[in-house]
Curated annotation (Swiss-Prot):
Role this protein plays: Substrate recognition component of a SCF (SKP1-CUL1-F-box protein) E3 ubiquitin-protein ligase complex which mediates the ubiquitination and subsequent proteasomal degradation of target proteins. Recognizes and binds phosphorylated sites/phosphodegrons within target proteins and thereafter brings them to the SCF complex for ubiquitination. Identified substrates include cyclin-E (CCNE1 or CCNE2), DISC1, JUN, MYC, NOTCH1 released notch intracellular domain (NICD), NOTCH2, MCL1, MLST8, RICTOR, and probably PSEN1.
Assembly and binders: Homodimer; homodimerization plays a role in substrate binding and/or ubiquitination and degradation. Component of the SCF(FBXW7) complex consisting of CUL1, RBX1, SKP1 and FBXW7. Interacts (via F-box domain) with SKP1. Interacts (via F-box domain) with pseudophosphatase STYX; the interaction is direct and prevents FBXW7 interaction with SKP1. Interacts with cyclin-E (CCNE1 or CCNE2). Interacts with PSEN1. Forms a trimeric complex with NOTCH1 and SGK1. Interacts with NOTCH1 intracellular domain/NICD and NOTCH4 intracellular domain/NICD. Interacts with NOTCH2 intracellular domain (N2ICD).
One Pfam family named in its UniProt record: F-box-like
Gene this chain is encoded by: FBXW7
Naturally occurring in which organism (per UniProt): Bos taurus (Bovine)
Protein name: F-box/WD repeat-containing protein 7
Modified residues (Phosphothreonine): T204
SUPFAM superfamilies with a match to the protein in the record: F-box domain, WD40 repeat-like
Length: 706
């Protein structure tokens, strides 16, 4: 029922469910309601006259003294209550109309805020069409069931239903039954305090009578007829209590089918208010927020449209901060609002951050692919390494240079010239760029000025790989050694020797160095003592790729296998098999490993269990070797020699779409490298046969939250 109330509140806001500002509609609805009330008032009178005639009584006779429980007197009192309720409702509507005229400007602001909330909710609805269809199907099944308590949604959101609901609740004199507004009016509760005066329930209600007693209405049975209880009623009730649950439901179905509409209406008037209590407003703020914390973000946005008090709770910044933590969203950006929020509504930066990230993810998944920025440079040479951080892109090439680009404008900011051989490896942090070359040197550059700060000499062959951690960089060379450098002073601090072939990959976490080489070995080093702690043996061919998270070492080899090692003991924990060729690239995050292979497949692994979770294949799989990959909590991005960049769903392994498709793909066009941020994708493309010009493509998936 509470879920239905949320849906009602949301629908009314979307359809302009308030009566304000539409006097013609309001007048017509009042006339219709008055006609219904007159019919209801005439029916008890006819019943009374017929009953009196059958018993030989005179209609309108004075009751006998002491006849305090006279049913006619109770009926007259109820009719009076009805007229009083109508008068109160009419006067209340008049006061509301006057208040609306005074606050028309404020209402416009509220409408704008509601439109914004509707847009936020729609964004989430669009992202989950299947779940929305399931909810619609479920709602229809509930509406079409034999239950008489729940009205269809369109009837609940009608102006006539809103008015009669108000009148109905005025007839229920229990002050503990909270009026739950279905329109735009604020809740009764505007402070974060629990409502006092509630009758505590000593035990969980087991019958509807217990529920009414818990709500303080145990003695408020409304009688709409003067007929005395029929004989045998108590026996029937005892028999009813002795039946099983399914038997009771069957009996109720038969009873409802045999009732007249007025009798069904009476049931609704008694039952419905008990299930329309705004339980959230009865709780302290902390408990209310705790309850709301179990809602999905899209449900929170719907809850915010129910009433003012729920919106205040659903806008809670700490609540949305927890939602952001669950999704790995960092500190929220200071997003400009289009207007000043009305006093009483606190804008939540964390909520804005969550919605922004959701819209960005939607852009990646199915947003329009706008024409990418094209960054041309390096002529027809190969782009051998690529770095992307913030709004700065750095590309290295076998033309002996590096280029620094703006990811925003697409302009080449500067070209770093100094190497005398091709650049084959690079790293970047803040304003520092480090490059390794076939000229056997490393160079440290200032990214802002393009100045070469240090040239690091020591290796006797090509610097093939490197890894930067804070102020130190570890380089691996074809001379079979590794060197640890201080990038501030340019000094070589340590030399690690032990491999007997070219070092192809290296990882460094500030405490341990892990290296893989063409000698089939993986080694774990203590750089401070320059000692090899473990030699990880097991591969039967060259080691081409490494990942290291401080606990596990993951190595990929030309022998087609991937091995998971314990860095402390040096033991092989798992051998991951399934690829058919060289594992060219890997990424490891939170025990999830994604590997790309020259056999054109990509696999997702759980390194704790050694299981392959997904294989990214099918009719849309790559048609050639996978060259590079990146992944986050939602997506996997892969590039290939077939000239495409593909987007996959990390959890399901399903293909989503192609992000880049080169016209020369399949005939020489290659995507060599990719680097992705939260909102941008940078691709290094070209060819070795002249069919595709060497360039960088920058795709933007950011959203405008202004």
């Amino acid at each position: 029922m509470n879920q239905e109330l949320l849906s009602v509140g949301s629908k009314r806001r979307r359809t302009g469910g308030s009566l304000r500002g539409n006097p013609s509609s309001s007048q017509a609805d009042e006339e219709q309601m008055n006609r219904v009330l007159e019919e209801e008032q005439q029916q008890p009178r006819h019943q009374e006259e017929e009953h009196a005639a059958r018993n030989g009584e005179v209609v309108g006779a004075e009751p006998r003294p002491g006849d305090q429980n006279d049913p006619q007197q109770g009926q007259l009192e109820e009719n009076n209550n009805r007229f009083i309720s109508v008068d109160e409702d009419s006067s209340g509507n008049q006061e509301e109309q006057e208040e609306d005229e005074e606050h028309a400007g404020e209402q416009d602001e509220e409408d704008e805020e509601e439109e914004e909330m509707d847009q936020e909710s729609d964004d989430f609805d669009q992202s989950d069409d299947s779940s929305r269809e399931d909810e619609h199907t479920h709602r229809n099944s509930v509406t079409n069931s034999n239950s008489i308590v729940d009205l269809p949604i369109h009837q609940r959101s009608s102006p006539f239903y809103t008015k009669t609901t108000k009148m109905k609740r005025k007839l229920d004199h229990g002050s503990e039954v909270r009026s739950f507004s279905l329109g735009k009016k604020p809740c009764k509760v505007s402070e974060y305090t629990s409502t006092t005066g509630l009758v505590p329930c000593s035990a969980t209600p087991t019958t509807f009578g217990d529920l009414r007693a818990a709500n303080g209405q145990g003695q408020q049975r409304r009688r709409i007829t003067s007929v005395q209880p029929p004989t045998g009623l108590q026996e029937w009730l005892k028999m009813f209590q002795s039946w099983s649950g399914p038997e009771k439901l069957l009996a109720l179905d038969e009873l409802i089918d045999s009732c007249e509409p007025t009798q069904v209406k009476h049931m609704m008037q008694v039952i419905e208010p008990q299930f329309q209590r705004d339980f959230i407003s009865l709780l302290p703020k902390e408990l209310a927020l705790y309850v709301l914390s179990f809602l999905e973000p899209k449900d929170l946005l719907q809850a915010a449209q129910t009433c003012r008090y729920w919106r205040i709770l659903a806008e809670d910044n700490l609540l949305w901060r927890e939602k952001c933590k669950e999704e790995g969203i960092d500190e929220p950006l200071h997003i400009k609002r289009r207007k000043v929020i009305k006093p009483g509504f606190i804008h939540s930066p964390w909520k804005s951050a969550y919605i922004r990230q959701h819209r960005i993810d939607t852009n990646w998944r199915r947003g329009e692919l706008k024409s990418p920025k094209v960054l041309k440079g390096h002529d027809d040479h190969v782009i051998t390494c690529l770095q992307f951080c913030g709004n700065r892109i750095v590309s290295g090439s076998d033309d002996n240079t590096l280029k620094v680009w703006s990811a925003v404008t697409g302009k080449c900011l500067r070209t770093l010239v100094g190497h005398t051989g091709g650049v084959w490896s690079s790293q970047m942090r803040d304003n520092i760029i480090i490059s390794g070359s076939t000229d056997r040197t490393l160079k440290v550059w200032n990214a802002e000025t393009g100045e070469c700060i240090h040239t690091l000499y020591g290796h006797t062959s090509t610097v093939r790989c490197m890894h930067l951690h804070e102020k130190r960089v570890v380089s691996g060379s074809r001379d079979a050694t590794l060197r640890v450098w201080d990038i501030e002073t340019g000094q070589c601090l340590h030399v690690l020797m032990g491999h007997v072939a070219a070092v192809r990959c290296v990882q460094y976490d500030g405490r341990r160095v892990v290296s893989g080489a063409y000698d089939f070995m993986v080694k774990v080093w203590d750089p401070e003592t320059e000692t090899c702690l473990h030699t990880l043996q097991g591969h039967t061919n060259r080691v081409y790729s490494l990942q290291f998270d401080g606990i596990h070492v993951v190595s990929g080899s030309l022998d087609t296998s991937i091995r998971v090692w314990d860095v402390e003991t040096g033991n092989c924990i798992h051998t991951l098999t399934g690829h058919q060729s060289l594992t060219s690239g890997m990424e490891l995050k939170d025990n999830i490993l994604v590997s790309g292979n020259a056999d054109s497949t990509v696999k997702i692994w759980d390194i704790k269990t050694g299981q392959c979770l997904q294989t990214l294949q099918g009719p849309n799989k790559h048609q050639s070797a996978v060259t590079c990959l990146q992944f986050n909590k939602n997506f996997v991005i892969t590039s290939s020699d077939d000239g495409t960049v593909k987007l996959w769903d990390l959890k399901t392994g399903e293909f989503i779409r192609n992000l880049v498709t080169l016209e020369s793909g399949g005939s020489g066009g290659v995507v060599w490298r990719i680097r992705a941020s939260n909102t941008k994708l940078v691709c290094a493309v070209g060819s070795r046969n002249g069919t595709e010009e060497t360039k960088l493509l920058v795709l933007d998936f950011d959203v405008d939250m202004k």
